[in-house]
């Protein structure tokens, strides 16, 4: 059974109104601060996964930080499609894209309370780099996941040349 029909790389402005609405819901599920999301949307490449009806079912926002480093700014899978390996597939797709773009490192930042996300990234080869304290204290509404208040930001990275050497 095919769950998705394609992964496309698009810009926000290239999306239809319906796809923008579907994507906005996904973006907000990963980062509830819409103003923050809007601050990076113009600068990212959107990797969007569509189902066969052309509905947005998953997204990943990738920012090129400099000539060889990239950051995953946002990753979300529609709730009714979670647990099917789509996030892992998107991450793998993006890692291959970064390699083809001659990138050497991918960063991702997530909350200290995002236990599922921390597990996912580590399963994909990311390693913890450092913690930025109190990043989420300034959010308008406190964020709780699995009963844990999200306060600190955990920074993970994957060094692609090391990944190739170990395979």
Language-model features: where?
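Short hydrophobic/aromatic beta-strand or adjacent loop that forms the aromatic wall/cage
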Residues: 44-46, 150-155
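Conserved acetyl-CoA-binding loop-helix of GNAT-fold acetyltransferases
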Residues: 77, 83-96, 123
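Short proline/glycine-enriched turn/loop segments at secondary-structure junctions
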Residues: 141-149
């Amino acid at each position: 059974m095919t769950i998705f029909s394609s992964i496309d790389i698009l810009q926000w402005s290239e999306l239809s109104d319906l796809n923008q609405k579907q994507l906005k819901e996904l973006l907000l599920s990963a980062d509830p601060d819409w103003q923050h999301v809007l601050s990076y949307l113009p600068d990212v490449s959107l990797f969007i996964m569509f189902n066969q009806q052309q509905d947005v079912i998953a997204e990943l926002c990738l920012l090129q930080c400099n000539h060889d480093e990239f950051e995953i700014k946002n990753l979300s899978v529609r709730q009714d499609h979670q647990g099917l390996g789509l996030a892992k597939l998107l991450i793998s797709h993006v890692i291959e894209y970064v390699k083809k773009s001659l990138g050497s490192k991918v960063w991702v930042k997530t909350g200290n309370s995002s236990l599922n996300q921390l597990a996912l990234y580590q399963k994909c080869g990311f390693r913890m780099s450092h913690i930025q304290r109190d990043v989420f204290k300034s959010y308008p509404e406190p964020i709780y996941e699995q009963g844990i208040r999200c306060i600190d930001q955990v920074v993970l990275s994957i060094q692609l040349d090391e990944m190739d050497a170990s395979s």
